[in-house]
């Protein structure tokens, strides 16, 4: 009885159960079901991470390529095939298809062609803006001025020329000269005829004016 006070059954149970009541061995050991769940979660996380990285990489390449052109293919001039130029200019193959030098030349040729088309459609001006004379008009102007000068000049008249005989005292023979007569006045203008009409025919010479 004396020892029962110190060693009661309740104290004995609590003394023996306290070191083992707080320990759960099942939680520390992984069962097959818990191991499968953990492996599935790891697979899903890894696959999601790889998909995210791949999508971000593709989006990054698209954003970078949209601003400065395709990174793998360098831009080339459509005319001289150069890849380095301070400025890309518009050309016949589209925007930014020519280098700076070729673009300037192309622009000059385009302006020159448009100026030539405008001058051709207008018909009265050249590329420099200077009016050109019509060939037919200039020819008519030249012809009319010459005719006006000919009609006003006393040396230009319409003549009728015919062969007439005249006597040469030096050779004692008759020769033929051109008898030039003005149509309007019917006056002989040949200086030889002024004295030819006053020469008397010699009896020793026979001539026929009807021939």
From Swiss-Prot:
Factors inducing expression: Repressed by HAN.
The keyword Transcription regulation appears for this protein: yes
One Pfam family of this chain: GATA
Keyword Membrane: no
InterPro entries associated with the record: Znf_GATA, Znf_NHR/GATA
Phenotype when the gene is knocked out: Effects on sepal fusion, petal number, fertility defects, and carpel abnormality.
Keywords per UniProt: DNA-binding, Metal-binding, Nucleus, Transcription, Transcription regulation, Zinc, Zinc-finger
Source species, domain of life: Eukaryota
Region Disordered: start-end pairs: 111-131
GO cellular component terms given for this protein: nucleus
GO molecular function, one term: transcription cis-regulatory region binding
PROSITE patterns given in the database record: GATA_ZN_FINGER_1, GATA_ZN_FINGER_2
Gene3D superfamilies the UniProt entry points to: Erythroid Transcription Factor GATA-1, subunit A
Subcellular location: Nucleus
Chain ranges of zinc fingers (GATA-type): 77-102
Leader sequence residues: none
GO biological process, one term: flower development
Assembly and binders: Forms heterodimers with GATA18.
Function: Transcriptional regulator that specifically binds 5'-GATA-3' or 5'-GAT-3' motifs within gene promoters. Regulates both flower and shoot apical meristem (SAM) development, especially for establishing organ boundaries in shoots and flowers, probably by controlling the number and position of WUS-expressing cells.
Family as reported in the entry's similarity comment: Belongs to the type IV zinc-finger family. Class B subfamily.
Name of the protein this chain belongs to: GATA transcription factor 19
Lineage: Eukaryota, Viridiplantae, Streptophyta, Embryophyta, Tracheophyta
């Amino acid at each position: 009885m004396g020892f029962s006070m110190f060693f009661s059954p309740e104290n004995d149970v609590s003394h023996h159960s306290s070191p083992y009541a707080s320990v759960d061995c099942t939680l520390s050991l992984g069962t097959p079901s818990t191991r499968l769940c953990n492996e599935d979660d790891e697979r899903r996380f890894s696959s999601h991470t790889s998909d995210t990285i791949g999508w971000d990489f593709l989006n990054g390449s698209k954003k970078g390529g949209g601003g400065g052109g395709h990174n793998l293919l360098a831009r080339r001039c459509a005319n001289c095939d150069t890849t380095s130029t301070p400025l890309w200019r518009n050309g016949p193959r589209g925007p930014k298809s020519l280098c700076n030098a070729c673009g300037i030349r192309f622009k000059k040729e385009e302006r020159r062609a448009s100026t030539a088309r405008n001058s051709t459609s207008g018909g009265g001006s050249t590329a420099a803006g200077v009016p050109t004379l019509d060939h037919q008009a200039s020819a008519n102007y030249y012809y009319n001025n010459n005719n006006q000068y000919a009609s006003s000049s006393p040396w230009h008249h319409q003549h009728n020329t015919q062969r007439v005989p005249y006597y040469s005292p030096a050779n004692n023979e008759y020769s033929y000269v051109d008898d030039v007569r003005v149509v309007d006045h019917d006056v002989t203008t040949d200086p030889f005829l002024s004295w030819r009409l006053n020469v008397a025919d010699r009896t020793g010479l026979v001539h026929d004016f009807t021939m």
